Amino acid sequence: MIEITAEIRALIDKAAAGVELAGDEYIDSADGLIHCKKCGGQRQTVVPCFGKLGYFMPRCICQCQQEAEEQRKAAEERQRRMERIKRRKTQGLQDRYLYDYTFANDNGQNPLMDKARAYVENWKEAYKNNTGLLLFGDVGTGKSFFAGCIANALLDQDVPVLMTNFPTILNRLTGMFSEDRSEFIASFDEYDLLIIDDLGVERSTEYAMEQMFFVIDSRYRSRRPMIITTNLKLSELKNPPDLAHARIYDRILERCAPILFDGKNFREENAGATRQAAKDIVSSKHD
């Protein structure tokens, strides 16, 4: 801050004669400069003219203006982040029902959900160490819900996640040229976490097995984590029927820690509740 000499003060007073003040500004009698009524900070300063004698008095921002600008930028960043998360969810959760697979909707009946929460809490370490999960067990035991909760929680943290399945992938690949297929499979590497739901439901044709291998191998080489859900038994994964399956399963077992889902069939329980609700509706009497 330049010392306000008598010479400089005369220049300040001369400049102040024609200045227009905002409603929240005043000219301080001590230094003759424009100040903020709210915080008392300077909104004008004194700067020497470079290369020649003299001074000029440019505007500057006070503390409350600085805080307001920081709040504006923070609000803009929050808005951009929300829009980015929305786009990520649209891209990463291609089936609308997956939006409901959240920890908030967990009924607390599956003790394995604590592992899903732990995975999210330790995501940075899991990503760094390329730690994936293999969720295996009977139909309806909560594997997809478990994976979906992880997907939604990480997406809410602005982490790129894709949850899909091989029938969808194979359908997209159908009709593509070889170069386009390679580019499509490589696009999965844009996601920090890739979730393949229901491994084993796809047809085991030579073409399908080849494309499945390309997807898993690409992920394996990218050293990014993946979560696989399947109704297959662990013994089936460890003892594949042929080389084509072995190449896929070996890579999954190396990168994904197995978690057994052997509880009750939640899907059947939900179906029972749905049937009862439908029965109540159709049998209700109207006045």
Locations of regions flagged by a protein language model:
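Loop/turn-to-beta-strand initiation segments
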Residues: 159-160, 190-193, 222-228
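Walker A/P-loop nucleotide-binding motif
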Residues: 127-147
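A short, basic N-terminal segment
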Residues: 1-107, 269-287
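Pre-Walker A (pre-P-loop) alpha-helix and adjacent loop at the N terminus of AAA/AAA+ ATPase modules
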Residues: 91-133
